[in-house]
A protein has these predicted regions:
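Extreme N-terminal leader/targeting segments of oxidoreductases
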Residues: 1-38, 56
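N-terminal Rossmann-like FAD-binding beta1-loop-alpha1 element of flavoenzymes
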Residues: 33-63
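Hydrophobic alpha-helical packing residues
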Residues: 53-54, 152, 197
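Dinucleotide-binding Rossmann-like beta1-alpha1 core, especially the glycine-rich loop
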Residues: 84-162
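Helical element adjacent to the flavin cofactor pocket in flavoenzyme catalytic cores
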Residues: 143, 171-230
Length: 230
């Protein structure tokens, strides 16, 4: 399978995160042939996290990234370390039931726990700060927060006076607070996870756009200058 041409760019977009990154990665371009258990395409959160998980389980891993590690949305997002659904759960209950909604909330909190544990385990410096507050401007926002609180016992609902303990504004009607959600530097998190994977033996390649993938009994990934068999 041949892949469509990708955007021809390689360095991080100008942003606060890029300007304050822990370091500038300099992983080599893939050249020659390499054989591994698993090859991962893409050096964002999904790819780098998968590399860490597989290395922890003893797999021989290679990762190829067309630009820099965490070059795309993984390195330039809001940095919120949160779970939840972002919408009133009622519409989801009609489709997947209350058990499905509860499973989504549980998976979200488990995801936060995984990131927390990984930061601690590998000593990743990514400016993690705990505590998350959301404020509502309209009564419908408060109604939504109340619904969320019914699904999540860790949500602390705030009235207008209580909200003043968290933000210096009187524009909002109320909100909610969660102590086990937080904020971090997403680029530094992804860079730290890549370093953790590398230290466990993962081979990481940048500036290595995948041009072709073959499947079947002899799967392989092809770049301009190299091939990885997996």
């Amino acid at each position: 399978m041949f892949l469509k041409k990708t955007i021809e760019t390689s360095e991080h977009a100008e942003s606060y995160y890029a300007a304050s990154g822990s370091w500038q990665t300099d992983y080599p371009e893939l050249e020659g042939e390499l054989s591994v258990d698993v090859v991962i395409i893409g050096g964002g959160f999904s790819g780098v996290s998968t590399a860490v998980e597989l290395c922890e389980k003893g797999y021989k891993v290679a990762l190829v990234e067309a630009n820099r590690i965490s070059w795309g949305a993984s390195g330039r997002n809001g940095g919120q370390l949160i779970g939840g659904m972002g919408h009133n759960p009622d519409s989801f209950i009609r489709t997947i039931g209350r058990d499905g909604v509860e499973a989504i909330y549980q998976m979200g909190d488990e995801g936060v726990d995984i990131v927390k544990e990984r930061i601690e385990k590998y000593g990743i410096d990514c400016d993690l700060k705990w505590g998350y507050c959301e404020a509502g401007l309209k009564p419908r926002h408060l109604r939504a927060y109340k619904k969320w609180a019914e699904e999540d016992e860790d949500i602390q609902l705030l009235d207008k006076s209580q909200l003043g303990e968290f933000i210096n504004s009187d524009l909002y009607l109320g909100g909610y607070y969660k102590s086990n959600w937080g904020h971090l530097h997403p680029l530094n998190l992804c860079l730290g996870e890549a370093k953790a994977a590398e230290n466990m033996g993962a081979r990481i390649f940048e500036q290595s756009t995948v041009k072709k993938i073959t499947y079947g009994n002899n799967p392989a990934v092809y770049t301009e200058k190299g091939t990885i068999k997996a």
